[in-house]
Amino acid sequence: MSEAISLTFPDGSVRSYPAGTTGREVAESISKSLAKKAVAIALDGTVRDLSETITDGKIEIVTREDGRALELIRHDAAHVMAEAVQELWPGTQVTIGPVIENGFYYDFAKNEPFTPEDLPKIEKRMKEIIQRNKPFTREIWSREKAKEVFAAKGENYKVELVDAIPEGQDLKIYYQGDWFDLCRGPHMASTGQIGTAFKLMKVAGAYWRGDSNNAMLSRIYGTAWATQEELDNYLHVLAEAEKRDHRRLGREMDLFHFQEEGPGVVFWHGKGWRMFQTLTAYMRRRLANTYQEVNAPQVLDKSLWETSGHWGWYQENMFAVKSAHAFTHPDDKEADQRVFALKPMNCPGHVQIFKHGLKSYREMPVRLAEFGNVHRYEASGALHGLMRVRGFTQDDAHVFCTEEQMAAECLRINDLILSVYEDFGFSEIVVKLSTRPEKRVGSDDLWDRAESVMLEVLKTIEEQSGGRIKTGILPGEGAFYGPKFEYTLKDAIGREWQCGTTQVDFNLPERFGAFYIDQNSEKTQPVMIHRAICGSMERFLGILIENFAGHMPLWFAPLQVVVATITSDADDYGREVAEALREAGMAVETDFRNEKINYKVREHSVTKVPVIIVCGRKEAEERTVNIRRLGSQNQTSMSLEEAITSLVDEATPPDVKRKLAAKKQLA
């Protein structure tokens, strides 16, 4: 070992330290206050314990305010939770406890599973352990010692974990006071640095190693943050998300349901299907005059999926089918035993449509769009309302173009995607370019050209938006068949949703032998661009329901108006009002029940009807209406004609309004 190490600091300065120097000693050499605030170091980008001896490299001192400290806080909190559990319930075995998005969990082997009532007790003991401020210390054990110690403690799951660690790999044991655990680390300096901005969230069951053949363990989920304010904000978002849960709102608004016989497929009710159709009609209008809408078969022979490559790399997510007779009589050689698959994607079908008939460079680009029903197998535990289903509709499109047309087509697609999102009220949008992964098809030269074009497109997107649209690069995250743009939206409560994609494909046209005739009368492979805006229409509707908390814009509401009467002698006028609104194109229902008007208003507010028109004797005599808005205590009285004009204008979709305004300007 050399006598000195050389460390480069973030400001570019370089300092020498004796060999064997720890991260803590480096922090102390800068200032005592920094050493006090330090929780770890990052050496060449890798976070490490303060107590580790370090070597040459680029060093950063990580404090609690550093974003990288959050994972340490959560990791340490998981260890403290495990210690608290074993103090409260001796004999409980600890298994694994990773950091996850927004928190952590730990799985325990306990005779009686935890209940929600146990969580406050565990939290209280965790705070006591944190207050003890015991240092985290690390030891390296041999495999034999680790197995012997854990076996003596009755920690059979830890023994199994030790056996699974590859030979020759160090076994790290982290202590916090007398309590210890098998762990890769790193950890902060002491339990006191965790702070008290944590909360245990829920208990659940989990099979050991995720295998239903293994024992059921008891899992505790928690969350931890650097500050109480961050914790409070997170809990507020969770509470808001629960209120906005599209599954609950779907029931309350009578939009859809799921049932056992059709796991992961949606039963759309009348109102929900109207909303689905409104989205489809809107998207159709946006594609008119630009795309050819096509429809490819839902069931295709296995051979096509073998050619496309899906049968090889996507088979576990596909549904394969035979005729019912072939299924029940697999040995019947006279029966048609061909294997078909429900399409998981629309792209192979679109290549077949492009290939049908000779294409000239003069016809390029060819833009094909489909609202295609696709089916993908998802594990039952992964299904989640409209957000994760097995059968869904993609607003899919594929552009076949020349390499020279690629940039213009990507920009055209981008403009359409951003315009759609803005029509639905999303203003915070991030566009990221995913570049070549290690495993890929196509030459480096082809990737160089494609990425160069897409980088220029990304730059143009940011410039044209005046910086309003944020952009970024995701190195190595592209598909094996080409680079792609990913579009992420931020909703009303700050959650991010990845929706749209624009993906260049060098692979599929080659697999299917697609070509066009170029200017030199030569066969040339087209560039294929996959494009989705909503992605899954079902998921996008789920996002919209949660974003608006069910309070949909009038143009998109599944039921726009309820006409409710105060007394039966206003029913005839109520029918007239409802019919006039229907003739104007509004979605209207009536409520002439013998109930108090406030009861009716409350009931329809629960189902998120945007507009309730109240008609009584006075309104009937004066031919007026009383308008009540969802979420507002205000009431507006106006003539029936004014109400129809106002509501129809408000219920006009934004794209239609733009066209009407453009026509008006030309007149």
Swiss-Prot record:
Cofactor binding notes: Binds 1 zinc ion per subunit.
Catalytic activity: tRNA(Thr) + L-threonine + ATP = L-threonyl-tRNA(Thr) + AMP + diphosphate + H(+)
Domain (TGS): residue spans on this chain: 1-64
InterPro entries the record matches: aa-tRNA-synt_IIb, aa-tRNA-synth_II, aa-tRNA-synth_II/BPL/LPL, Anticodon-bd, Anticodon-bd_dom_sf, Beta-grasp_dom_sf, TGS, TGS-like
GO cellular component, one term: cytosol
One Pfam family here: HGTP_anticodon
Coiled-coil segments on the chain, per record: none
Cofactor(s), by name: Zn(2+)
Region entry Catalytic, spans: 245-553
Record protein name field: Threonine--tRNA ligase
